[in-house]
Amino acid sequence: MGNSGDLEQALQDGNIFRQLNALIVAHLRHHNLSQVASAVASATMTPLNIEVPPNRLLELVAKGLAAENNGTLRGVSSSVLLPSSYGSITTPRTASIDFSVNHAKGSSKTIPKHESKTLSEHKSVVRCARFSPDGMFFATGGADTSIKLFEVPKVKQMISGDTQARPLIRTFYDHAEPINDLDFHPRSTILISSAKDNCIKFFDFSKTTAKRAFKVFQDTHNVRSISFHPSGEFLLAGTDHPIPHLYDVNTYQCFLPSNFPDSGVSGAINQVRYSSTGSIYITASKDGAIRLFDGVSAKCVRSIGNAHGKSEVTSAVFTKDQRFVLSSGKDSTVKLWEIGSGRMVKEYLGAKRVKLRSQAIFNDTEEFVISIDEASNEVVTWDARTADKVAKWPSNHNGAPRWIEHSPVESVFVTCGIDRSIRFWKESV
């Protein structure tokens, strides 16, 4: 009987080893490491061309790390409308600025002058843009329902005078209405989009011939904003409905916050964003409120009403250390909020925004805040610590840009707008 059990265990272990070897070979092959893949396949007697989904090994490792880290997270009550697997992934803490300290006026930093170049055009208004987490790609979405994907190194080559460079590497067509927002999967070559057709669509940009989505989530409302959880297993959707929708990427299930107030909430959501670890997420709403949610329980843990007077909040993003939130509103102000206390710690003034749903963003080091001045059609920059305005540059768009997006890893950003153009900004030589 014991020998039978040992044999069964040996067979099970052998099967796991074969699966692991197949995943390793497929991973190496998909990343163009053909010689290494061939050597491993030969040494382990694994078929070189075994069929395994791309990035399957990465996905399994990510799930394993998430499960390991979940042991340190507090549990979720059974009354909460979330699967037990949902939680945050711990990432290394990023060196950050303590914005709660008052910095003297006159001690502001100077941002290097930037220049921009037009890359491409949509057939109509360009409504949104997003960089990949590694800064290697960015995508734009238009009112013409198309999505364009650019490779940043090729953009730089083109700007440097390389006439052979072709930075536009993919164009996707699969929505029936204008695109509202975009996001990249944190670990896979997947780009998602949301649109006025109530859909969230998934595109695999590793496939050169793919023009259509391989997965579609159908919401009940216009999906105005989306954000991937850092694990890639869940995504947030902000819609015309006042309550954020949370989707399980694998099961298509939609979950709602368990304690969302029934009264005092009336506006659509303009933007949703996760923090860097997924431990908290935020909504910026047309009713003028900023709302913070626990990333594990999905409970609303703080609501800042009238954050921008009686004006709608157009954007809200976290600092990398998750201690502060930067918001923009149609009252022409940009504000920095301390999450723990809910108090405003900085206010950035001097740029008019009353018509467009413009964002305020940090640069990659969080030393500067960048936004748009509709009245002067300029890109405006403030020192993030002192709140001094330190630079303003003509946008070079015909009409004020409606979207601005900064690379997470270097000093480059993208603007796009009603003139249909996409402009790439970098430091002047």
Curated annotation (Swiss-Prot):
<feature type="repeat" description="WD 1">
    <location>
        <begin position="121"/>
        <end position="160"/>
    </location>
</feature>
<dbReference type="InterPro" id="IPR001680">
    <property type="entry name" value="WD40_rpt"/>
</dbReference>
<keyword id="KW-0539">Nucleus</keyword>
<feature type="repeat" description="WD 3">
    <location>
        <begin position="218"/>
        <end position="257"/>
    </location>
</feature>
<keyword id="KW-0677">Repeat</keyword>
<dbReference type="InterPro" id="IPR044633">
    <property type="entry name" value="CstF1-like"/>
</dbReference>
<feature type="repeat" description="WD 4">
    <location>
        <begin position="264"/>
        <end position="303"/>
    </location>
</feature>
<protein>
    <recommendedName>
        <fullName>Cleavage stimulation factor subunit 50</fullName>
    </recommendedName>
</protein>
<dbReference type="Pfam" id="PF00400">
    <property type="entry name" value="WD40"/>
</dbReference>
<comment type="subunit">
    <text>Homodimer. Belongs to the CSTF complex. Forms a complex with cleavage and polyadenylation specificity factor (CPSF) subunits CSTF64, PABN3, CPSF30, FIPS5 and CPSF100.</text>
</comment>
<dbReference type="GO" id="GO:0005848">
    <property type="term" value="C:mRNA cleavage stimulating factor complex"/>
</dbReference>
<feature type="repeat" description="WD 6">
    <location>
        <begin position="351"/>
        <end position="392"/>
    </location>
</feature>
<keyword id="KW-0853">WD repeat</keyword>
<feature type="repeat" description="WD 2">
    <location>
        <begin position="174"/>
        <end position="213"/>
    </location>
</feature>
<dbReference type="InterPro" id="IPR036322">
    <property type="entry name" value="WD40_repeat_dom_sf"/>
</dbReference>
<feature type="repeat" description="WD 7">
    <location>
        <begin position="396"/>
        <end position="429"/>
    </location>
</feature>
<dbReference type="InterPro" id="IPR019775">
    <property type="entry name" value="WD40_repeat_CS"/>
</dbReference>
<dbReference type="GO" id="GO:0031124">
    <property type="term" value="P:mRNA 3'-end processing"/>
</dbReference>
<feature type="region of interest" description="Hydrophobic">
    <location>
        <begin position="20"/>
        <end position="41"/>
    </location>
</feature>
<feature type="repeat" description="WD 5">
    <location>
        <begin position="308"/>
        <end position="347"/>
    </location>
</feature>
<dbReference type="InterPro" id="IPR015943">
    <property type="entry name" value="WD40/YVTN_repeat-like_dom_sf"/>
</dbReference>
<keyword id="KW-0507">mRNA processing</keyword>
<comment type="function">
    <text>One of the multiple factors required for polyadenylation and 3'-end cleavage of pre-mRNAs. May be responsible for the interaction of CSTF with other factors to form a stable complex on the pre-mRNA.</text>
</comment>
